[in-house]
UniProtKB/Swiss-Prot annotation:
Residues 13-34, 1107-1118 have a biased composition (Acidic residues). Residues 1-69, 1044-1071, 1090-1118 are annotated as: Disordered. Coiled coil: none annotated. It comes from Caenorhabditis elegans. Residues 35-60 have a biased composition (Polar residues). InterPro entries: ARM-type_fold. This is Uncharacterized protein C30G12.6.
Amino acid sequence: MESGDHLGNLFDDMVEEDNDEDSFEEPACEDSFDSQEASSKANEPQNDSFDEPIQSSVSKQSDDANGEDEINEEVIQEQKELDLNEEDFNLLTIEEVPLDVLTARIRRVFTEVTYRAEPAAIALFDVAHKIIFKSTMLDCKRNTVIDSIIEGLISIIVDERERDQGAEEAEHVLMIFIAKLAIKNKSMKCSDLLYKLILLVDRLYLHADSFVRCRIYRLIACLMEEANRYADVMREHGDDAFLSDEDPTESEVMIPSGVKNRWMGKLAKSLLDKSPEVRCKAVIALSLWDHDIECKTTCCDEVTVNDLLWKSVHDVDESVRVNAARRVHIANENDIDKCIDYVETSKDNRVKQAIIVRLASDVSLLSFSEKQRFRLVNLLNNSDSARVQDVIHQLLVESWMKVAGDEIISPSIFPFPDSDNNNIPKEFPSIILEYLDPLVDPTAVYVFMKFATVRFIQKSTVQQACGSLDVEKFMKDLLSMTIPDCERVGLMRRTTFRLIPKDNNDGNEDIRKIFSRIFISRCFVDVIFNFAKGRLDATHLRSRALTFFLPDVTTFVEHLEKFCDAYFHRNMSTDYTCKDLVLYNLLHLMNVATKYGDLHDDKMLYKHALKKILGNSSFVFSSETILTIVMICFDLCKIGDDVKQLCDWMCDTAKQLMLSHEEVLNLEEAMKNDKVLEQMYLRSATMLLATCKHEEVESPTASMSSLFKTIIPALLGNKNEELQQLGLELIGFATSIDFENCEPYLKLTTLLIQRGDEVLTSTGVNTLIKVIKSQGFPKTANAIFQGEEQTEDDCQDALAKVFEKALVSLQGMALVQSVQDCLSMLSYGRYAWSKLMCAIIMLVFQKSNECLPLVKIFASYCKKSIRSDFNKMNLLLGFCRAVGIISKTGEDDSNIKLLEMTELVCECISSVHTIDGDEVIPQKKRKTDNEEELYPEIVLANRMVGRANSHPSSWIIRHVFTAMATSLRLECVPMKIVDTLHELLVDTYTVVRFNSNKTTQIAFKRFLTHCEKVITLHERMNALKLGVDFKKVKKEVICADEDPKSVSSSSSLGRKRGRKRENSEEEEKIDADDSFELFQYVPKSTRTRIRPTVNVEEDQNIKTEIEDSDDLEDSFEL
């Protein structure tokens, strides 16, 4: 191995990502290591921006003449070119010069590196290395070459001048240059420069200036990175020597282990530095250690480097979090799970984006487990951030498709292609099915396949430069593929479309191939149809896609009937796993073909085929499939008469299905004798349920009413819980359209809710909510409890208790469904139901740690549904009731996130201004009986202040007032009402101050200060009410006896600041203290503070003067 092989290309892979994230400008470095040369160049104009990769010591002079500009450019170009034939840069003459000449030459080298940056560093590295190596060979007490380097580096580090980004980049180039020289010389048993650098770091890493600490940590990062690179190269050299039967030499450790451990401990402590810039540099340097090395923290706990980096991911500063996310070690599946967990739960979009970039760029597709792949792909659908979805789309899809294209040509489920004779395009979209099984999560794979298809079209078309997709060329390329190649990638065309395999050897394997081909065809068709939206040639593109990928509707219907007969027959011996998925995708493609087809009788033909499939009792379908088929049949109806005829047909078919295997012709008699099969019950009831669900069915027909009376009691009385659940759902939809005939079944619903089964309870709650939405709460309550209760109010109270008890008894996804149904009911009508809102709030924030989407559902409800003051007051009363219940438990025993709950409620009930054109219109407020405006923010604040006054030592006061100080907006509340609230807070603070702990006092005082800021804002707004042009006010003549400061502005605030207020006797005795620091033992009361008021007489004089002026504008009127 050559002596410089371990260095590689000097600066190719040195990219400092943290330069863009730093929020401060570091001081500029010294421009030269040679003081004499620096003094000689002091009179010349210099450019210190370091923006260009190669800098010149003479700045460009801008002249008007074109000839002078060309001359200047030629001079600058000559100065940029580095002459390596100079004597100072001649490697052959270094052996024959004394130490003082070597010192002058090394200064010249660093001067050129300073000005010319990376190109000079690459060209002069060997020269600098030989100079340093030669200086260490000389017999002298003081090595002036190394001392010059150290002195120049110190001048860079401790310099406090402000720097721009170019200067920081030049500083980084110098540090890398010095670190590479130190490691290179250490590898040749010459460690003087490295030890000097170690001493410099140990002397300055505890410096008081944060800028100095930042540069020291950057120097540590450069040294560690070069040492790691040398270790990697030597490790590879050792592997090569082992394979070639040579004796591998022992690799020498560049930086002693004791020094590395000492630096690691200091960097770990620096993660808690007060400066975010220092913490950023500490994270970057610490990430260069191995992920599993343990170090001791300030609490003497041993944690790994990766754990410290993950702690920095949760730092308070965003730049620190982003830098830590970019540099966490991803070494195994646990680290990948940790990254995905953070992306799924965090709200910091920049950090999530940085982690996804790491996962896409640094982790191969083959390193992810199947579960991890699906979790990442599901973020394309489930993520709330469009930026995160875009990063996954552009980076993750690109990375995974490249890896898949390098590994395979076609999925293994299809016939393996002949590698020597195939015309399959590289990175065809269907190859991702090898790593993402659509049977596991069809929706996630469908989304990924669509993005992969768009990427493939962009890469294969010629018009990608102009931003459009050439779909015609894409289909022509597919048409050029041979039939065997199409078979190998799962591509079906109109001529090769089939659903029944030719050789039915393995049933499940064949149905998987069919599903994959149909799935791929659906993705291609949907991508082309989405692309055609809004285009002038949309009809042409859709017709081309249908002609290319799908058969005509008549042939398609024949394929559908044959497929159902082959795989859904009752007497089938094999249970096929994915036949329902195949049928669902087939129905989707059939819907597309009939909607955008050319023939007018396609819909009638399609509906007739579906009715034939539904009426065939020998076919066995799942409930979801039956619902889908029935909905499609109603969607294909054109007029209302067709809907009624189809309803009668559905009812008649359901009766025939229940009597299909019995000799009895009377349905009621067959039900009474238990002659109807449960399977036929399920199918008939599902058909009837789907009929009631459709929006076109608004009223029942005679056959529907008759069937309701027959089938609902039979379903509720059946022992099968699935049939009971279906009966409850049917009651809800049937009662919505036929309340008179189905009213008695509501009592049975309440009885089934009280049985204790979670599924039946959740279904019963859903049924009652559907009836309440259609018929109203009083009518529903009377229908259930009219005979048991005396008055209508008692009936409504009884129904309310049923809901509240049922909601509290549920768990898991049944609870999620019921909460969502209850919130939809509350948003649908006006219900003063604070108890139900209290139960929902407590359940949402009590179950927030159980991976249930309750908080997301509740936040969406607050954002979209709570707009009127009535709904705000209902939410407020429910919250206050919940706070009262939570306060009865201890802080350690309570598992409710009170702070998050209060923040969400405060943000929801806070009033905001709405903008209509150029006017700002505040929201209208509901008035009480005393004709006073009601503000929910003030109601909430008064209730919480009253609780603080009655229970000042309660632990909830700290959380509630901390959230109110940051989330409760009072800007829209009139100043008079806020002033009253402020006086109440001042009176209550005395009670809180003497009866609560320090943190509670701080939280209460924060809200008090928040009110004071709002009052100050109102005062300023009142002062700006006068529509006066500021420029004209400045031109007014100032009286000689008037203070200039008091009339410099049109507002009364300037006069108020200029006039000093005399303190009262009580205020002179007490020192004012507005601090919120934790070391303050007892905060002083704000009771004695007197808010400065505006001088009314002076304001009146100014108003009179302004009214007398006719030429004043109203440009500042709010």
